């Protein structure tokens, strides 16, 4: 049948909503006949959608009892990853990137009549970027690296500072970088980000944090001068600068270890020994105390002036440690004197109860010998740079003679435990130990003869025990070996196992004269060690090879401070940490000999590399460190909770972007200098894992890597 409309023949009757006349089959319909409606589909919804968001579309089906539709994108049922996808409910999700043509057609096709459909175009736009934080860290002079973290950044995004575009490097969807010039004295820097067209629009504005110190400098300093950096302490050093942070630490009061009471409390009696409490006190102090530099220097001193609870009563260890911590920022002579008078050292190396010898005999030489050989001078004469002095035949020159050892031993006689009130006992030796006060002298037991010491110095006869002690210590303190011998070891413990002779010489010069004519000023020495060009070389050179193997206790404290922890022991004890470090051949004040856990002169077999901490490293310890790392990241440490769950700080970063989480691990544990290939491998290893497992695996891979085990 044909349709006749206003005199025109249109063909088969398909017109809708009009009055029609139908001729044929012997019947006719007049102008007042009922209108016939044809099926139709109309699509309505947003005309634009941004990447990362969704748009909802509605299909209105007319003149069909079945109103169900199937959705298409660019004629593809359900869409695909190139043009975007759409659900049965009409929710359209654009692709991850803008397609070649950024407008697509969303179509609804009638289920009842597939030839009936409706479409609507939708333009795909770039997202609006969102800034979470912006940080500017110095490179040199007024040049800064600006790091902008946030979300929805796309390749081609543009950073603006103060309304002006700056050359921008796209790192990831959550990070952008730029090099900017910030004039001296600038306190505020407004930053926003504009993604490129289509749909370019400015983000929120934030004020960038302008730091005095870059992340690598701050993190490396904290690695050298504390028991491990955390994000908070890194930001603190960035804000204050290296020199000001050191000054702040010098003025931070010490955090003393609590004295262990007598009789022992039950918590100390688990192994019938006070070491449980003594070691717990040490772990808690070094992990949580604000006086991190003081405690780190005290730790270094404890590995030079060695005593051990293997032979000493552990009650005296807390007093001894507090002595080192209190004296850490004083003068090296003060350290020598207070160590010599401490009951812990007295008992350990037999100066305690060493009385004057009968005619023809000599008093105990133990302390006299070790004080010179291990603590202050060394066996052979040194140049100011720590290298050996040689005689005309090319042989080392001994620092002292056996006869001089005996003379010093005589100078150290007459000392015993103080009474409970700190006074001199009525009898010698005092059989009642006082572990918490300096030793006192019983003059009748002191050798009052004259003594000939180093460099021909003579202590006159008739002096008191204290006068002889001070005279003997001054004689050693003034010896030119002390500076290079002690300073090299401090450098080894804090910065690098292999300091250059020039580095040692620079610090020795400060030891000899702090600039004001004072010898042995520990604050000047410590500042010089940490601020030396060799100490800071790795701040700007990620390939710098100086540093040292992290000894077990430092490896553990660095991890715990880096990720955070909660002590869950009913008594607040930290002692369980000793059980783990002991498996790696180290625990607080438990060296097996006066030579420390490792001697400063240790050389890796088969090499000429001086690397003291490697004396603790072997196949078994390497495997045990891997096992301990697994326990740490999986929260299996007795008495502690270590949260690396999906809701932890690292977990939240991983949920937003695994890249950001790995970068944060790099900031905390690798000075913000994680090698690119390592970062890529870690991200590949965690791809596809759940959020919590991403955090744990990434953390494990970082802390067990050789790049982390050796602190550069």
Predicted regions and their residues:
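N-terminal accessory alpha/beta regions
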Residues: 231-327
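Immunoglobulin-like IPT/TIG beta-sandwich domains and homologous Ig-like subdomains
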Residues: 67-75, 89-91, 95-99, 111, ...
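Flexible, low-complexity segments enriched for small/polar residues
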Residues: 219-226, 265-267, 479, 483, ...
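Bacterial lipoprotein signal-peptidase II cleavage site
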Residues: 26-34
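Beta-strand/beta-sandwich contexts
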Residues: 36-62, 123-155, 198-212
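C-terminal motif of bacterial Sec signal peptides marking the signal peptidase cleavage site
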Residues: 21-24
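Bacterial N-terminal signal peptides that target proteins for export
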Residues: 2-12
